């Protein structure tokens, strides 16, 4: 139970749990990962009804190989514990992960971890339900290293720059953009989250970009976070899916080159050589490690 499953997270598609129509469309999309939302996308008066719709959607829709996730309300609300209990009791066998919101400390994650442990025993579930945590408050970012290492159940951290803007007092008219800042206003926060995730062996994921009518700006944000080490990004609209899939997938020519270099190095290593020249490029153990972590492992995970 300590082994974390490897899941594609190039695109995490946000889907309101109150809409059967949108859940149907999400199940038919090309997204790697769909999270059915019980938090911001659902009005307080509709949250209990949305749980029922989510349970039905998880059980009846064909999700293919997608990661099926439910985003719950934060632990300061009266909804969070019932979100977990009702969804897991109703559709635990059809659920891969639960996304926690406004995570501040490791104790927040451990609360959900213990509750899920009890539910899994009660329901005799055959596999563990994973956790994903949104880091979207200053306190959460200050504690991000400890949060990332809080439990083996935790699979990824997501940078939620919308609420983080409010927490920091950052002027951000368009969530996910830099709004005139001379550079990337999110560079430090993203970099810090990625480092915490890599040290803990979990996935770093970038959050939303609100202006879904601007695919070029969305692509730029995807590329920025990908270069920093993020494995994927939220899509708040289906039109963003293809952009993110392309941005976070290794290019076919890069895969071919990486496999060529890996093969050449393996052959050289068998002959006792430590570094070789391939097409004018020095290849050694360090460069092979980079290729595996940035190209080859991703290609294997995505079936490329």
Predicted regions and their residues:
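Expand to "…catalyze enediolate/carbanion chemistry for C-C bond making/breaking, isomerization
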Residues: 1-304
């Amino acid at each position: 139970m300590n082994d974390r499953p490897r899941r594609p997270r190039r695109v995490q598609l946000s889907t309101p749990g109150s809409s059967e129509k949108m859940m149907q469309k999400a199940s038919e999309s090309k997204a790697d990962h769909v999270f059915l939302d019980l938090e911001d996308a659902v009005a307080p008066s509709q949250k209990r009804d949305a749980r029922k719709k989510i349970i039905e959607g998880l059980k009846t829709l064909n999700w293919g190989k997608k990661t099926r996730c439910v985003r719950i309300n934060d632990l300061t609300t009266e909804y969070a514990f019932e979100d977990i209990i009702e969804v897991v009791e109703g559709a635990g066998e059809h659920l891969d992960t639960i996304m926690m919101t406004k995570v501040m400390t490791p104790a927040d994650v451990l609360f959900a971890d213990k509750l899920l442990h009890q539910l899994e025993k009660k329901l005799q579930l055959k596999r563990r339900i994973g956790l994903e945590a949104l880091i979207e408050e200053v306190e959460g970012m200050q504690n991000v290293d400890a949060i990332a290492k809080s439990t083996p159940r935790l699979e990824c951290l997501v940078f939620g720059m919308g609420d983080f803007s409010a927490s920091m007092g950052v002027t951000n008219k368009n969530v996910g953009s830099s709004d005139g800042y001379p550079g990337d206003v999110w560079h430090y926060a993203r970099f810090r989250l990625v480092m915490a995730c890599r040290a803990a062996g979990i996935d770093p994921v970038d959050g939303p970009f609100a202006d879904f009518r601007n695919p070029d700006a969305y692509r730029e944000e995807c590329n920025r976070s990908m270069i920093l080490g993020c494995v994927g990004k939220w899509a708040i609209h289906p039109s963003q899916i293809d952009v993110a899939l392309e941005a976070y997938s290794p290019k076919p020519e890069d895969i071919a080159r990486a496999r060529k270099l890996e093969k050449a190095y393996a052959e050289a290593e068998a002959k006792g050589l430590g570094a070789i020249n391939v097409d004018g490029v020095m290849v050694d153990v360090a460069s092979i490690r980079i290729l595996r972590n940035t190209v080859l492992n991703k290609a294997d995970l995505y079936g490329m």
